């Protein structure tokens, strides 16, 4: 009888452990594990990126990246994106809210990536939005992007800090900041962002998830609704939405200039990707542009990413 009771207790324990394997409690908050891609976070209880964004969709979004005319054939791939994104899914990257919000954030982030790495033009096969991930670094840079006045992240002799990556990084101080963020020595080795696609995506996602200054939102925050504008923000016409992601990432290089080609190209990539992913551009969200927004960080104060 005692043996039978012990066996029953063992079976109950195994059953309870199995039920808890995917869901745990941390400080009274439900957290979940989804294997290697997402674990130990409440955001992991939602669908992960690979649940709703598959390799064939990545191929559709970046259909011409490996064409002979492209400048980084064979470099970018789906697995590199998923591997980099997985580092940030526990923080809510494309796991905040439901499936539609996750898909919209994938399209928004990759919309920036596609626009910033495109070699497309209006008459190109498939149109200008079909040529994202054509580059992994700036071609024929006109300068070395070395700011000798920066003592915290001084230029390394013989190293050039031209644009590299999925959302290109410029200038020595920015390579230093991003390198600290992803725990890579980019100040000494900025070339890593044009040699390793996973690191290139990781640097871009880190920028998406990280505020440029204290008490400011990240691009992720303004997109998913984590940010509540202050009175000063509303007076500056800054509101949550895709438009504010451009403000966070580029400031007055893109925003506050009315309707410009640079701004509209980024919006076009975002909406095109929404269509290809089956979400539809009608779900682009409010406050799509930043033409009237005052920059969070004017050029005189910005980090010049």
Regions found by a protein language model. Give the residues of each.
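A positional/structural detector of protein chain ends, strongest at the extreme C-terminus
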Residues: 1-3, 304-305
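Cleavable N-terminal signal peptides of Sec/SRP-targeted secreted and luminal proteins
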Residues: 2-21
């Amino acid at each position: 009888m005692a043996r039978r009771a012990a066996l029953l207790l063992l079976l109950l324990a195994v059953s309870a452990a199995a039920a808890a394997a995917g869901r745990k409690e941390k400080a009274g908050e439900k957290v979940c594990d989804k294997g290697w891609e997402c674990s130990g976070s409440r955001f992991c209880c939602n669908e992960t990126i690979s649940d709703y964004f598959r390799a064939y969709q990545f191929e559709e979004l970046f259909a011409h990246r490996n064409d002979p005319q492209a400048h980084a054939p064979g470099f970018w791939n789906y697995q590199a994106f998923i591997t980099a994104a997985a580092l940030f899914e526990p923080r809510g990257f494309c796991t905040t809210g439901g499936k539609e919000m996750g898909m919209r954030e994938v399209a928004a982030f990759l919309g920036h990536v596609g626009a910033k790495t495109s070699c497309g033009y209006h008459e190109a096969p498939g149109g200008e939005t079909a040529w994202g991930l054509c580059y992994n670094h700036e071609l024929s840079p006109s300068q070395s992007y070395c700011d000798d006045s920066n003592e915290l992240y001084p230029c390394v002799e013989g190293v050039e800090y031209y644009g590299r990556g999925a959302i290109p990084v410029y200038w020595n101080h920015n390579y230093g900041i991003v390198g600290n963020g992803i725990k890579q020595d980019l100040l000494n080795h900025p070339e890593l962002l044009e040699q390793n696609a996973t690191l290139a995506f990781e640097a871009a996602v880190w920028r998406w998830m990280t505020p440029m200054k204290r008490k400011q939102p990240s691009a992720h925050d303004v997109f998913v609704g984590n940010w509540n504008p202050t009175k000063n923000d509303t007076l500056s016409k800054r509101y949550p939405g895709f438009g504010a992601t451009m403000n966070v990432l580029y400031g007055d290089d893109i925003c506050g200039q009315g309707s410009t080609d640079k701004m509209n190209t980024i919006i076009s990539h975002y909406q095109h990707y929404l269509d290809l992913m089956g979400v539809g551009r009608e779900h682009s969200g409010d406050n799509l542009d930043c033409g009237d927004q005052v920059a969070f960080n004017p050029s005189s104060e910005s980090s010049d990413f």
